[in-house]
């Protein structure tokens, strides 16, 4: 099986984890395995990597690397929000480092049958795990009322014309349900004549994808769990691709990098050593971004931001 995906910020992310011989690391978004492969090289000969992915294609494609690494790579089909349960099953108590590469993979975008992109016509699916119990994008489009659709387009897609597009969807589906990516994209484009660089359906597709996969809820849950699973000195690296993801990462990192407020202790003559401590230290004040050379080689990397934090003792 071919799983085409160009790894973003590869060297920067793996360097941020500072892999050590014998360490145990989590790649919560295995994808094409680029980050995991380099991690395994740098924590050799005894270090191991646990790779998670919701996408069965990614797990199947990674089996060759599993065989090559002879017990040092374990792949599990699971969303990264379930990391605590996965590690418990593997009898792993803590991690030396963890990383997440958020968003949709090149393989998912380029496979028309997955329904993530309007560049090629495909079913309006957008499920990262292909789970038949999860509602598809088509199911949301064809059943939710205009207010609920507008909320998805606005809050998850940051689409300015969310209400107008939602009303169009409800009107059109009365004649025939939405079934393909190009059907939806063409309807939206027809409402926005003379658009320039960014296709007018881009934000709507982002909003639907995030809603279908509960991406923001999964991210918030996973980050809180991962911070607790890191060993003192361990690093957590997260690559985000749009402002909604980055805001969550930035907020949770900064909150954990401040000592928790305890109103009961405020103003009491307590020694500094006895006061609550911060959980994380920010490794960089600002996120790392791809070089011009990387963007030229892989234009999809343009919006990537890497934030890194270190667990304090």
Curated annotation (Swiss-Prot):
The keyword Protein biosynthesis does not apply. GO terms for cellular component: cytoplasm. It is found in: Cytoplasm. Keywords: Cytoplasm, Methyltransferase, rRNA processing, S-adenosyl-L-methionine, Transferase. It catalyses: cytidine(1402) in 16S rRNA + S-adenosyl-L-methionine = N(4)-methylcytidine(1402) in 16S rRNA + S-adenosyl-L-homocysteine + H(+). InterPro entries: RsmH, SAM-dep_MeTrfase_MraW_recog, SAM-dependent_MTases_sf. Its EC number is 2.1.1.199. S-adenosyl-L-methionine binds at residues 33-35, 53, 80, 101, 108. Specifically methylates the N4 position of cytidine in position 1402 (C1402) of 16S rRNA. Belongs to the methyltransferase superfamily. RsmH family. This is Ribosomal RNA small subunit methyltransferase H. It comes from Magnetococcus marinus (strain ATCC BAA-1437 / JCM 17883 / MC-1). The gene is rsmH.
